[in-house]
Amino acid sequence: MRKIAAVVALILLCFAGIASAAITKELYPGEKALYEAAKNEKGLNSYDTGPTWANWQALFDGFEARYGIQINYNDLGSGATVVRLEKEKNNPQGDTAYYFMPFGAAAGGKELTESFKPTNFSRIPDTLKDKDGKWFCIHKATIVFVVNKNLVKDIPEGWQDLLDPKYRKSVVYLDPRTTGIGYAITIATTYANGGNLDNMETGIDYLAKLQKTGNVRMIEKTTEYDKFIKGEIPVWITYDMNAYRAKYIAGLGDAIDIVIPQEGTIASPYAISLVKGGPNPNAGKLWLNYITSEEGQGLFAKGFVRPILPGFDFPEEVAGKFLPDSDYERVMDVDWVKASKVQKKAAALWGSKVLGE
């Protein structure tokens, strides 16, 4: 037993040594001191950061290699994450929470998150952060179609094309009541059909029509990435970061097409917060600082995820794989603060019109 204990102690010592050696050069002022406080906590609980989404696996790997602190994660969806935080309010279990920006603003408004300003906070645009740091955006992504050409003969070029009967039981997207991307899709269809945040019925009526025609194959609760990779989804409405990852990282290549709808689309900001009263606050702060550091933002970029820091360029090997800039000119601007205020109303309207609830 003593020999086993000695081996375990040696392993732990090695991990501690690796982590300490890894930060001889700080990513930001105060990193070493924060690490010293965090290393004695019990790991890190990161809510809604599924590893197949937004290149989170690369950030997990980078963080754990640098600090030797294990990350525990779940993949709930933005709305479900806020619900989870509310249920755990008197006994918080998460340290950080990640979500579509309107849900982050909602969590902050419900006093579920702590004020914390990570490194590079001043570089994040004012409209994409709470002034006190109760939430702040860390990346963006654009709504696109991803089409499996082995299952679909004619590539849809826009939202109206998806209403064609030839796409019967072909379209898959996420539930806007519980996921950020689902709500983003609702906003995108609204803008593409001439509506706005004061009149989201145009987009929801479109989704209701898509449902009524029988062209919706499934409305999912969590990310459909693995199902798409397995060839189970003909037309997937998702973010460009997922599309490029499927094409170039998962290796689907020319078997899929990525389409920015002709009528227009939107680019969605995603936010993260320090959970109020979380069990490992210093590890949470260390994680948030890592995400907003140049290194963390660079790892997003390597995975086709648009960093939030202005002027942050994609690596050359990644930039050349994006659709032409002319396609991205169809991306429309959204007032995200206002979007956060009408989310609940839009979710109820979608449930009523699309599902008849």
Regions found by a protein language model. Name each.
Residues 1-41, 357:
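Short, low-complexity disordered leader/linker segments with a strong preference
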Residues 23-31, 39-58, 270:
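Extracytoplasmic "Venus flytrap"
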Residues 41, 140-144, 267-271:
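Short, solvent-exposed beta-strand edge segments and adjacent coil->beta transition regions
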